[in-house]
Amino acid sequence: MENFEVIKALFLGFVEGLTEFLPISSTGHLILFGHIIDFHSDGGRVFEVVIQLGAILAVCWLYRQKIINLIKGFFSGDVESRHFAISVLIAFFPAVIIGVLAVDFIKSVLFSPIVVAIALIVGALIIFWVESKQFEHKTDDATKITFKQALLVGLAQCVAMIPGTSRSGATIVGGMFAGLSRKAATEFSFFLAMPTMLGAATFDLIKNADVLTSDNMVNIGVGFVAAFIAALLVVKALVLFVERHTLRVFAWYRIVLGVIILIAAMFFNLSA
């Protein structure tokens, strides 16, 4: 039976890694598939945090050379590196402020399947709207983002605190609305994810460190590795995809998933 739980942890790790950076809400998928396979982890919230950490570390690994060059450039006085680093910080801070003020409300009130389903569907409609508009893409390179554009993306990320919205979806769409090309918005979303998700993961791990035991470490470790590997596969593929295609396919998928979660919540006792 314990081996079966490890397999479930492996599966959910892959689900997290595959969905974290697609604009389709990893939270919605974890709720749905966790219910379907009846996964129970003694680590609870920590399991989710650690597999999210696995996904974001995959991005750090893929962009490691850019990160190293950015750090070197920042401290050597390179104007472009400093501009981009400050842009990421500008986009990051709204989430810090809102997160600190609203974290308890979000987890106690908004974290429910119904909210997730509604957010999925509303988010899909916003994607359709943004893709239907011919916004002037003034920025094709993520490193050339302006401070104003960065702030708009940061505010969009705050909306993603509503479970089911999708952090990547909100920041990519927010970037496009602000004047970034689809590819530039996607790449900036990845860079913004690093401080955002690493910060959130660190906060949650410290807060819930007491639930980490030898009994759940295997499940957590397996989920972490699975999420890391799956995210490696997704990130590069997504950048190539958005260069050639719109986000409409993800919008349709969100609607289908939202309807499924609504039905499951109303008739099959689906819970977060």
UniProtKB/Swiss-Prot annotation:
Pfam families (UniProt xref): BacA
Entry similarity comment: Belongs to the UppP family.
What is this enzyme's catalytic activity, as reactions? di-trans,octa-cis-undecaprenyl diphosphate + H2O = di-trans,octa-cis-undecaprenyl phosphate + phosphate + H(+)
Q: Cross-referenced InterPro entries, in alphabetical order? A: UppP
State the organism named in the record.
Acinetobacter baumannii (strain ATCC 17978 / DSM 105126 / CIP 53.77 / LMG 1025 / NCDC KC755 / 5377)
- The transmembrane residues are 4-24, 43-63, 86-106, 109-129, 145-165, 186-206, 222-242, 249-269
Q: Name one GO biological process term.
A: peptidoglycan biosynthetic process
Localization per record: Cell inner membrane
State a single Gene Ontology molecular function. Answer: undecaprenyl-diphosphatase activity
Name the enzyme's class.
hydrolase
Primary residence: membrane
Instruction: Note the HAMAP family from the entry.
Output: Undec_diphosphatase
Q: What else is known?
A: Bacitracin is thought to be involved in the inhibition of peptidoglycan synthesis by sequestering undecaprenyl diphosphate, thereby reducing the pool of lipid carrier available.
Q: What EC number(s) are associated with this protein in UniProt?
A: 3.6.1.27
- In the record, what lineage is assigned to the organism producing the protein? Bacteria, Pseudomonadati, Pseudomonadota, Gammaproteobacteria, Moraxellales
| Topology within the bilayer | Multi-pass membrane protein
Write out the coiled-coil annotation as residue ranges.
Answer: none
The free-text function statement in the UniProt record for this protein reads: Catalyzes the dephosphorylation of undecaprenyl diphosphate (UPP). Confers resistance to bacitracin.
Which UniProt key words apply to this protein? Antibiotic resistance, Cell inner membrane, Cell membrane, Cell shape, Cell wall biogenesis/degradation, Hydrolase, Membrane, Peptidoglycan synthesis, Transmembrane, Transmembrane helix
Q: Which cysteines are joined by disulfide bonds?
A: none
What do the Gene Ontology cellular component annotations say? plasma membrane
Q: What is this protein called?
A: Undecaprenyl-diphosphatase
